[in-house]
Amino acid sequence: MKYEFIKIDLDTYKLVYTNKDKKEVSIEFKRTIEMAEKLQGIVATARLNMYKELSKQGITKNDLIIKKDDGKGHITYDETNYQEYEKFYIQLEEAIILNEMIEKLFGKNIKDLFDDMGIDNIPEAEQPMQLQLFSSKLGQIISKGLDDTPSEGNKE
């Protein structure tokens, strides 16, 4: 899976990759403030969604935290359950936002884009790492560019 992001101007980039048919594909895209804000709001949105779901079920954050009293005045709190629950919601929100951005930027959903980029040509064990690297690089470009913030979009 060979690809490259190339900066054209302040907010315009292009994704260049060799597709599964060994043809070079170039897709130009523009980053916007709205996209950067969506990326920056992933954790907050995920936590809100998590709290909404917990509330629907009648569960509070404290219900997920295990309190241990050793009987000698020492109390410890195990937040593992809460942290895992929160992590799940953050990963879910990241996947949703990433797919929305890929559809908006490249006109394809994430599965179709990666299939076209030849994800099947790399060992299955390496695929999650490749997806993570691509996602991280795209996220960096959208939020910070290669060296600056987006100027396109609603400046309010």
Located regions from the model:
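Short, extreme N-terminal segment that most often corresponds to the first beta-strand
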Residues: 1-34
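Short, surface-exposed, charged amphipathic helix/loop patches that serve as local interaction elements
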Residues: 23-156
